[in-house]
Structures are given as C-alpha cells and as structure tokens.
C-alpha cells in the first residue's frame, strides 16, 4: 500500500511545479539586457519573454508590448510557447488524476486501482516536467552562446532572466513529483501480502476445532460404556 505521506509530498511538489511553470511562461523577463562593454551606460533596458517584450527607462517607467503576431516570431520562441503551454496542460491533468489515486480521497476505493491511477498521474507529471525543461534549457543555451560569442555586438547580448530560473526549478519539481508518485506504489507487494493472509487464515480456523473435538468424543464414549456395564 502506498504511503500517504509520500503521496502528499509528491502532490504538493507537483502543484508547485504547475504554478511555477505557468508563472514562468507568462513572465516577460526570459532575457534581460546585458550591461557590458559599450552598453554599460544606457538609458533603456530591455527584457523579452515568450509573449511580450518590455522596455524599462532610467526613470523607472516600464512599458510592455505584446507581440503583434505569433507566426512572425523566431522558430525557437514558437516552439517554446507550444511546449510551455503543453507542459502546463499536462501538469494540470496530472493534478486531477493524482487526486483520484491518492489514499486520502474517497474516489476509487479499490487499493490496486488507486495505485494504478496514481502511477498514471505521476507519468503525466514527468511528461509535463520534461516539456517544461526543454524550452528553458534551449533559451539558456542560446543566451550563453550569444553572450560569449565575439561576433555578437554588445548591444545585442542578453543575460539570463528570472523566468528561466523559475522555469528550471518548476520543471524539477514536476519531475520529482512524478517519480515520487510512480514509485510510492508497489502493487506486487500488496498482492503477495493479500494472498498470504487469505491462505493462512482458513487453515488455522479449520484445523484447531477438529483437533480439540476428537479427544473429547473418545472420552465421552469410554465413560458411557463403562458406567453402563457396571
């Protein structure tokens, strides 16, 4: 039988992973302006996300513009959008499925069926974590490649934004949650314990009354025959 505490820990991590992935997907600071070289003194700082880009002035005013078209964006941005949306959908579905398979709920009272449902929820968490980790790692690689490339001008270089750190942590939470839910159930162990108890109980109840009744019957018969002839 799966441990209730382990399942709760896995489910909470999955919820945190879903929340972090959704926030990281919407944040506009996947890439932030790099203040190196000639661009160390500038009046405007830029940040780019999956859905919008923002400009922060030296006065503290920030202006954000949503991308006017999605089809005109670079291929890596489009792929990141699709994978992050799919990751959030997978994690949301995993949260719903895992609720049915957890021991603290009243759904699906059969313990074996609950274990199977919990494993399915864990698999969806793992898929959501993988889909959320790929675009984050992809953008992280592109930022580091352009930053250390001598062919890219200093004004075109960006640094790692806070959204990427949040995306990495959220993806790891989803992966760990899926692994916990998948390995917290052991159907084979439950099956062996169930059959062992079922076979041992009838043998104990049937053998003990017979052994106790046979000597008693012999003693009654012997006493009856002796008193009758005397």
Curated annotation (Swiss-Prot):
- Primary location class: other
Q: Provide the cross-link position: Glycyl lysine isopeptide (Lys-Gly) (interchain with G-Cter in SUMO).
A: 218
Activity regulation behaviour: The channel permeability is down-regulated at acidic pH.
**Segments of this protein annotated with the region Interactions with TJP1, TJP2 and TJP3:** 229-230
Give the Cytoplasmic membrane side ranges.
1-7, 103-116, 184-230
For this UniProt entry, which residues form the secretion signal? none
After translation, how is this protein modified? Answer: The disulfide bond is necessary for pore formation, but is not required for correct protein trafficking.
User: What is known to happen upon mutating residue 65 to N?
Assistant: Markedly decreases cation permeability
Q: Transmembrane ranges?
A: 8-28, 82-102, 117-137, 163-183
Disulfide cross-links? 54-64
Q: Which Pfam families does the protein's record reference?
A: PMP22_Claudin (PF00822)
Protein's membrane topology: Multi-pass membrane protein
| Extracellular-side positions | 29-81, 138-162
| Site feature: Paracellular cation selectivity | 65
| Gene Ontology terms, MF aspect | identical protein binding; paracellular tight junction channel activity; structural molecule activity
Keywords of this entry: Cell junction, Cell membrane, Disulfide bond, Isopeptide bond, Membrane, Phosphoprotein, Tight junction, Transmembrane, Transmembrane helix, Ubl conjugation
Expressed, tissue-wise, as follows: Expressed in the kidney, liver and intestine, with higher levels in the ileum than in the jejunum. Low levels in the brain. Expressed in colonic epithelium (at protein level). Expressed in the perivenous regions, bile ducts, and gallbladder epithelium (at protein level).
Q: So what does mutating residue 76 to N actually do? A: Does not affect the channel activity
Gene Ontology terms describing biological process: calcium-independent cell-cell adhesion via plasma membrane cell-adhesion molecules; cell-cell adhesion; innate immune response in mucosa; paracellular transport; regulation of bile acid secretion; regulation of intestinal D-glucose absorption; regulation of intestinal lipid absorption
Which residues get modified to Phosphoserine? 219, 223
Q: Which family does it belong to?
A: Belongs to the claudin family.
Q: What does this protein do?
A: Forms paracellular channels: polymerizes in tight junction strands with cation- and water-selective channels through the strands, conveying epithelial permeability in a process known as paracellular tight junction permeability. In intestinal epithelium, allows for sodium and water fluxes from the peritoneal side to the lumen of the intestine to regulate nutrient absorption and clear enteric pathogens as part of mucosal immune response. In kidney, allows passive sodium and calcium reabsorption across proximal tubules from the lumen back to the bloodstream.
| Protein name, per record | Claudin-2
- Gene source species: Mus musculus
């Amino acid at each position: 039988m799966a441990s209730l505490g382990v399942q709760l820990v896995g489910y909470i991590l999955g919820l945190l992973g879903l929340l972090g992935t959704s926030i990281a997907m919407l944040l506009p600071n996947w890439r932030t302006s790099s203040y190196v070289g000639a661009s160390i003194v500038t009046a405007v700082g830029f940040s780019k996300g999956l859905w919008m880009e923002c400009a922060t002035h030296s006065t503290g005013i920030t202006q954000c513009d949503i991308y006017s078209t999605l089809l005109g964006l670079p291929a890596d941005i489009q792929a990141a959008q699709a994978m992050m949306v799919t990751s959030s959908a997978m994690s949301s579905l995993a949260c719903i499925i895992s609720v049915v398979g957890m021991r603290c709920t009243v759904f699906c009272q059969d313990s074996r069926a609950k274990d199977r449902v919990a494993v399915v929820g864990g698999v969806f968490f793992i898929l959501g974590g993988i889909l959320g980790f790929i675009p984050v790692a992809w953008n992280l690689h592109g930022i580091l490649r352009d930053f250390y490339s001598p062919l890219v001008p200093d004004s075109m270089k960006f640094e790692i934004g806070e959204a990427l750190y949040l995306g990495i942590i959220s993806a790891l939470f989803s992966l760990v949650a899926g692994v916990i839910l998948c390995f917290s159930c052991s159907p084979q162990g439950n099956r062996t314990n169930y059959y062992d108890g079922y076979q041992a109980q009838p043998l104990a109840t049937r053998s003990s009354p017979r052994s106790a009744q046979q000597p008693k019957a012999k003693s009654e018969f012997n006493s009856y025959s002796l008193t009758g002839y005397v």
